[in-house]
Amino acid sequence: KIIEESLNLKDVRIFDYVEDEEGRKKPVLNKKETTIAQQKQDLIKAEFDNWIWKNPERREALTRLYNEKFNSIRMREYDGSHLTFPGMNPEIVLRPHQVNAIARILYGGNTLLAHVVGAGKTFEMVAAAQESKRLGLCSKSLFVVPNHLIEQWASDYLTLYPSANILVAYKKDFERENRKKFCARIATGDYDAVIMGHSQFEKLPMSTEHQEMFIRSQINDVINGIQMLKENEGAKFQIKAMERTRKNLQKKLETLLNTEKKDDVITFEELGIDRIFVDEAHYYKNLAAYTKMRNVAGISQTEAQKSSDMFMKCRYLDGITNGRGVIFATGTPVSNSMVELYTMQRYLQYHELERLNLTHFDAWASTFGETVTAVELAPEGTGYRAKTRFAKFHNLPELMGLFREVADIQTSDMLNLPVPKANYRTVAVEASEIQKRIVGELAERAE
């Protein structure tokens, strides 16, 4: 049983069964026996690792296979020092890391500008959009930015390129009576760029045919996951959870197909957009990952509608641009869990994950890491609990090599930006009576 759980990327758990008031058997986790079993599981994993490399022929074959798959790419270095930027404000001089990032967007494919706050991501994206249009690399760029920054983005765009022809979406433009007219302006106008908010972007529908194809592919992924769980005698609650996901997707598909088609609706495909620049892309990190793993922190099996919508549009743009139409920008690509790195890869290098057979989260996780169960302070702050996290990594050079095919990473240490020196001071403050009372109530509810 321990070996079977290990092969299925699960941490082993031991349950006792007690009868409730209605005579039904109820599983109760046996913490002591579970701890012993997990220690045995760790020993088995360690022994398997030792066994794998003992045989010279097997070691050589596996090493060759791994290197051919993951160590066969030389990282490309982008140099934008030759770029001239016609039409740019002559009073503004971009830094070397900015022109290199612009060169990456122009000459590479999908890109993640993982630059620290203050590194100049806004000007990088604006200049890349203008040069892409001038060089014929794209016909119309769409900037998707936080709602409260729309006007600031428009101002920054015209500061860098005073003569640029841009269309800015304000709140009134996406009101029901104005939306159709505004979308028609996008579709028929020859703009250098269109700027709109995150919530407005979500209101641009994909065609019914494309939505149907996308949802059916999701349903097939879930059905395959359910079949794998059944073949490996997966836990009932996991199968039930994935069945619920399948039913929700099926219901979503039925609603889509039963909705009366409106001929006057302009779809995203009809707007002529062939490149999107997404600012603060970490807002789209809640993209569901279907997995056999149980209750692992950071792995979401439910997704936000805006993330699903963004993923669908990224896949569409990949299809019409051969993987060159999506540029993300964020100072925090990974904030809470390394699962977010996998999510970014799904958005930006889905075809590469397909080539490596890593589109399914379990395949990605087993290649680059493993789950670790450790005792930690409970959220209510009054006790401890065992929590499983995707926290231990191996093959990191290969993972980062794969990630850096799309990610342009610039940290504060790498840039040495002219910022004032900060003096940090920790001040311990005594909890107030109200805070103590609220924490006490939370602890009671948790129990």
Question: What residue ranges belong to the model's regions?
Answer:
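Conserved pre-motif I regulatory segment
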Residues: 72-114
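Conserved SF1/SF2 helicase motif Ia
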Residues: 116-119, 124-155, 161-165, 320-325
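Charged, low-complexity intrinsically disordered regions
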Residues: 1-72, 162, 186, 190-194, ...
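Conserved helix-turn-beta segment of the N-terminal RecA-like "Helicase ATP-binding" lobe
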Residues: 148-174, 181, 185-188, 348-352
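Walker B catalytic acidic pair
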Residues: 279-280
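Inter-lobe coupling linker of SF2 helicases/translocases
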Residues: 179-225, 236-237, 244-275, 285, ...
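Short coil/turn segments at secondary-structure boundaries
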Residues: 18-19, 62-65, 76-84, 116, ...
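Charged, low-complexity interaction regions
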Residues: 231-239
